[in-house]
Regions:
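Active-site-proximal beta-alpha core segment in soluble small-molecule metabolic enzymes
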Residues: 1-29, 125-127
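Short acidic, glycine/serine/threonine-rich loops at helix termini
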Residues: 2-4, 38-44, 117-119, 149-152
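A general structural detector for well-ordered alpha-helical segments in enzyme core domains, enriched
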Residues: 7-14, 44, 51-55, 90
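Internal, charge-rich low-complexity segments
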Residues: 21-26, 35-67
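Glycine-rich beta-strand-to-loop/alpha-helix junction loops that act as flexible
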Residues: 28-35, 109-111
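Charged (often Lys/Glu-rich) extended helix/loop segments that serve as interaction or gating elements
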Residues: 51-202
Length: 202
């Protein structure tokens, strides 16, 4: 929030120069990037990093595809988010600076408006092992349908099933494209009661 506050203060100073030059700006567009959290608490985020660091340092069995260190990840737990973040942005006199100049603040809240409202569902198409024994769960979707600019999407999927017994399986989720790197997630996922074709992953 601090960098946005600084930017708004600087914009207000530039607005003053524009007004002195005879212009009449009416708003500042802060753009997007309103932070949100995908995890319920910070401990989940810390636990992930501890497990990742142990893997990278050789103290734990790799849980990622080809031991990928997943160096580039979105901050899946952040604070403050949404409204509290905006309060911080507008604190320290920034809101007053905007009011004094009769400036509207435009903002692109994007996915933060729908925080917790979205879901992707995919049917399990197959469960198999590669020739080297690597377990794969194939979904009736492809990686482009949920890929981000990060190395991985760090929210564990949910298996939608009424099964309460079965053999535990750990596997990688792969998509429908017939290419080597058609991974939905780059982490091994645990299914306590197994997974079967026809199940749904959310």
């Amino acid at each position: 929030a601090a960098d946005r506050s600084t930017a708004l203060r600087e914009c207000c100073r530039l607005v003053d120069l524009l007004i002195d030059a005879g212009h009449h700006p009416t708003f500042i567009d802060l753009g997007g990037g309103v932070p949100m959290s995908y995890l319920d608490d910070a401990e989940q985020w810390r636990d992930y990093h501890a497990a990742r660091d142990a893997m990278v340092d050789g103290y734990a069995r790799p849980f990622t595809w080809k031991a990928d260190p997943l160096d580039t990840t979105y901050p899946f737990h952040q604070s403050p988010v949404r409204g509290e973040w905006l309060k911080d942005v507008l604190s320290g006199g920034v809101a007053e600076m905007l009011r004094e100049r009769s400036l509207r603040l435009h903002l692109e809240p994007g996915r933060s408006l729908l925080d917790g409202c979205g879901v992707i569902l995919a049917e399990v198409a197959f469960v198999k092992e590669r020739s080297d024994g690597l377990p794969l769960v194939g979904l009736a979707m492809n990686r482009t349908q949920c890929r981000t600019t990060s190395d991985d999407y760090l929210i564990d999927p949910l298996l939608v099933t009424d099964r309460t017994t079965g053999e535990e399986v750990e596997a990688f989720l792969v998509g429908a494209y017939c290419i080597e790197d058609e991974l939905i997630l780059r982490r091994r996922i645990r299914f306590p009661y197994g997974v079967e074709p026809g199940d749904v992953i959310a």
